[in-house]
């Protein structure tokens, strides 16, 4: 078995006296997709924030590509190849779609540095991945649909050239047609070898798209394993505790 590109060992994270994440452990190999599922308040977002350096862990370890991440500032974690698409579709609403992407390019040093052939992800590649964004390129972030905002948030994350993409609440509030578009894009990204860890409320979709699943309940792991080896009933029992 290959060494996991991301390994989480005994991770505990707290808000005051509340343990939001309790001794969570899992690993994901390069190029795989791992689904993190659980009810609201299960600790999914806190887990992602702890991996990305946005929330300090009380104990445990996070290792990415053989390097420990605990205590590493969030901006350094981005430079090491991890990007987060947070719940809430974080974009600049007052800027156009194209300006949002330009800002991301410049922020990550991809806008004007080095030859184009050295850049794996560019605005043009984002537009190829999400044609709806090209059509809306001049519209403001506040003028586009929720689905387009999610596409834009994913595109901005990709411009940081990540090797691991974390997506919190992939399809929350999106129509079935837009969910299909988003997952087709994620499948294309995954086919190129990118590692995905994502939160999805739709249990069936989580199992169908992922290689592995981790189910959290009140901050603890209630079920983990290969997705195709799990029955829907077992996952739902773990999901609801």
Model-derived segments and spans:
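ABC ATPase C-loop
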Residues: 157-158
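Conserved ABC transporter NBD signature motif
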Residues: 60-69, 80, 114, 118-123, ...
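Helix-to-loop junction immediately C-terminal to a conserved catalytic motif
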Residues: 52
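The feature captures the beta-strand-to-loop junction immediately N-terminal to the Walker
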Residues: 37-39
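Conserved catalytic motifs of ABC-family nucleotide-binding domains
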Residues: 161
């Amino acid at each position: 078995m290959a060494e996991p590109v991301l390994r989480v060992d005994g991770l505990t994270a707290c808000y005051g006296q509340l343990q939001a994440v309790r001794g969570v452990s899992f690993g994901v190999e390069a190029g795989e997709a791992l689904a993190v599922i659980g009810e609201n308040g299960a600790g999914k977002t806190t887990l992602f924030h702890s991996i990305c350096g946005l929330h300090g862990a009380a104990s445990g370890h996070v290792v990415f590509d053989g390097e420990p991440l605990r205590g590493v500032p969030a901006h350094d974690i981005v430079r090491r190849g991890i990007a987060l698409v947070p719940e809430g579709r974080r974009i600049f609403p007052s800027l156009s779609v194209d300006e949002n992407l330009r800002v991301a390019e410049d922020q990550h040093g991809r806008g004007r540095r080095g030859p184009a052939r050295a850049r794996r992800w560019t605005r043009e590649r984002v537009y190829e991945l999400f044609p709806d964004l090209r059509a809306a390129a001049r519209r403001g972030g506040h003028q586009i649909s929720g689905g387009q905002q999610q596409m834009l948030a994913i595109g901005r994350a990709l411009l940081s050239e990540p090797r691991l993409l974390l997506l919190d609440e992939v399809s929350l509030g999106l129509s079935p047609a837009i969910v299909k578009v988003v997952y087709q894009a994620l499948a294309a990204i995954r086919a190129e070898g990118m590692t995905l860890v994502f939160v999805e409320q739709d249990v069936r979709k989580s199992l169908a798209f992922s290689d592995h699943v981790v189910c959290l309940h009140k901050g603890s792991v209630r079920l983990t394993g290969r997705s195709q080896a799990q029955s829907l009933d077992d996952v739902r029992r773990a999901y609801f505790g």
